[in-house]
């Protein structure tokens, strides 16, 4: 098998790897022995295994944590739904632009968080991470999928593109959409970046997640459709914000040890795992209580109560 390796001088060199089975004195197979020999007539690029397009696609899905963009889609669709409920026409084109801008902002937040968690050492010393990427960051740097500099570049490009895509939204909806986007950018970037490190501020990080992925994003989506800041859209985002905050909150539990060692004072670190368990129940319950209250007081149709069935699952 041919591949490239890093020598003691940190140079990439082309190699041939020979693997042979090893046996004990009685002839039983007990393992394998690998011998690496340098190939002198080829370059590292010629011997490096080819990576398929699907593998590359999956790699970038991991780096940018694309499956978690649902946390952006839900409040944006909710805001558009509220606009429709209030009698405003909904433009699918503007909805698509809003989703694109929000997704770029979310990707920039994900990758910048990975970069600064790497710089602080939080993700590097975290051995309780999940394979699903729910906690411990995307692990893209730790797995060698991309360099720290590469992640920082992806974050910068994503944030820059979100600003460019946001220009037509500002032209259509006015300066209020700029302030909402700017708030989302700053709170996303400085969630783990110094000097603010919002995620280390004993609950401020969790609060900002709930606000951004709940009321503010829903209100911003409705603002693009209507040109108005609708209180109903803000209210519709409250249960969504509680649920997104709950997802982040519960996945801070396995990060407790590494977060504590690096001074990342999340609510789990601040309260301790035992007391913090009640916080998850409170967030989850608050989401469904808020739905019930807004349906009962007439803010939203009584059929909204059907959403309570999701609590069973």
What are these regions (language model features)?
Residues 296-313:
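Extended hydrophobic alpha-helices typical of membrane-associated regions
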Residues 46-97, 101, 196, 200, ...:
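Topogenic membrane-insertion module of multi-pass membrane proteins
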Residues 27-39:
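PAS-family sensory domains
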Residues 2-4, 9-18, 23, 33:
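PAS/PAC sensory module
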């Amino acid at each position: 098998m041919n591949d490239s390796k890093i020598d003691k001088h940190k140079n990439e060199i082309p190699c041939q790897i020979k693997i042979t089975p090893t046996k004990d004195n009685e002839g039983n197979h007990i393992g394998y022995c690998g011998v690496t020999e340098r190939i002198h007539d080829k370059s590292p690029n010629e011997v490096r295994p080819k990576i398929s397009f699907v593998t590359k696609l999956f790699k970038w899905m991991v780096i940018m944590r694309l499956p978690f963009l649902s946390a952006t889609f839900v409040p944006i669709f909710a805001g558009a739904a509220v606009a429709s409920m209030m009698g405003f026409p909904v433009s699918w084109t503007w909805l698509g632009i809003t989703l694109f801008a929000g997704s770029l902002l979310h990707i920039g937040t994900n990758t910048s968080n990975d970069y600064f968690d790497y710089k602080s050492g939080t993700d590097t010393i975290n051995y309780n991470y999940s394979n699903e990427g729910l906690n411990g960051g995307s692990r893209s740097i730790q797995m060698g999928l991309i360099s720290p500099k590469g992640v920082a570049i992806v974050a910068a490009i994503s944030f820059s593109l979100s600003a460019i895509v946001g220009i037509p939204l500002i032209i259509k909806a006015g300066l209020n959409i700029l302030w909402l986007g700017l708030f989302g950018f700053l709170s996303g970037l400085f969630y783990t970046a110094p000097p603010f490190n919002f995620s280390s501020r004993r609950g401020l990080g969790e609060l900002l997640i709930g606000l951004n992925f709940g009321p503010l994003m829903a209100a911003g989506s409705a603002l693009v459709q209507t040109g108005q800041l609708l209180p109903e859209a803000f209210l519709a985002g409250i249960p969504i914000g509680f649920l997104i905050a709950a997802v982040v909150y519960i996945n801070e539990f396995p990060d407790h040890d590494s977060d504590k060692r690096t001074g990342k004072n999340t609510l789990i670190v601040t309260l301790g795992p035992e007391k913090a368990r009640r916080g998850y129940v409170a967030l989850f319950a608050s989401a469904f209580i808020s739905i019930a209250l807004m349906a009962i007081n007439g803010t939203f149709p009584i059929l909204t109560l059907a959403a309570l069935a999701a609590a069973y699952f």
